[in-house]
Amino acid sequence: EAGIECDCGSPENPCCDAATCKLRPGAQCADGLCCDQCRFIKKGKICRRARGDNPDDRCTGQSADCPRNRFHA
């Protein structure tokens, strides 16, 4: 939905204001495999292990989402 930055279901979430569904001041993210303590995880950190010989998925440092590498189906 427009204007919603985070899931405001839990008032205990330190990253998200439950009343406005907006990130709290200073927060970059509220959840996601590449979000830790309201901040994006640094670029290159493994967020999803690959199977077989494919490379692991790694955080970009610019998003809370863990991008799928091009080798994953």
Curated annotation (Swiss-Prot):
Entry's localization field: Secreted
Alphabetical list of SMART domains matching this protein: DISIN
Keywords in alphabetical order: Cell adhesion impairing toxin, Disulfide bond, Hemostasis impairing toxin, Platelet aggregation inhibiting toxin, Secreted, Toxin
Domain Disintegrin: 1-73
Any single Pfam family the record assigns to this protein: Disintegrin
Location, primary (coarse class): secreted
Gene Ontology CC annotation, any one: plasma membrane
GO molecular function: toxin activity
Expression sites (tissue/organ): Expressed by the venom gland.
SS bonds (residue pairs): C6-C21, C8-C16, C15-C38, C29-C35, C34-C59, C47-C66
Residue window of motif Cell attachment site: 51-53
Subunit text: Monomer (disintegrin).
Additional record remark: The disintegrin belongs to the medium disintegrin subfamily.
PANTHER family on file: ADAM A DISINTEGRIN AND METALLOPROTEASE DOMAIN, DISINTEGRIN AND METALLOPROTEINASE DOMAIN-CONTAINING PROTEIN 28
Job description of the protein: Inhibits fibrinogen interaction with platelets. Acts by binding to alpha-IIb/beta-3 (ITGA2B/ITGB3) on the platelet surface and inhibits aggregation induced by ADP, thrombin, platelet-activating factor and collagen.
Similarity annotation: Belongs to the venom metalloproteinase (M12B) family. P-II subfamily. P-IIa sub-subfamily.
The name this protein goes by in its record: Disintegrin molossin
The species this protein was found in: Crotalus molossus molossus (Northern black-tailed rattlesnake)
